[in-house]
């Protein structure tokens, strides 16, 4: 089954609640919430305070994509701020810490996933597959 998960990164943040409502009314299944720290990737985007506000504005499923260095440091905070699922880049930390981050998310009742950069071999996700959705 195909699911549609538009990223809110292109939204007008002054009108975020309204734009999320429009996305939901258009039939989106999830919201994709891109988090960039300027370290793991060159750009900087939104974070925990925006996620908390977004969670108050919608009951849609929110997939938080952490494009950040050492995501284990923030896994719990993003889960508690309103993420329904958190996806972690396997390149962002050691295998041990990515597994720990996945465990944190799952321990808080959230779904977890892993993602890779375009140039990373697909096989890099194999050690994590038993623990993710």
Model feature map: region roles:
Residues 120-124:
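Membrane-interface helix caps and helix-loop-helix hairpins in membrane proteins
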């Amino acid at each position: 089954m195909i699911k549609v998960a538009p990223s809110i990164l292109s939204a007008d943040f002054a009108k975020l609640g309204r734009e999320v409502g429009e996305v939901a009314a258009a039939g989106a299944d999830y919201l994709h919430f891109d988090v960039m720290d300027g370290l793991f990737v060159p750009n900087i985007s939104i974070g925990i305070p925006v996620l908390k506000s977004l969670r108050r504005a919608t009951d849609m499923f929110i997939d938080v994509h952490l494009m950040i260095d050492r995501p284990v440091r923030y896994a719990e905070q993003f889960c508690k701020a309103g993420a329904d699922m958190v996806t972690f880049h396997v390149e962002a930390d050691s295998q041990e810490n990515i597994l720990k981050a996945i465990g944190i998310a799952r321990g808080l009742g959230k779904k977890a996933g892993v993602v890779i950069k375009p140039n990373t071999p697909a096989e890099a996700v194999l050690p994590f597959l038993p623990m993710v959705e």
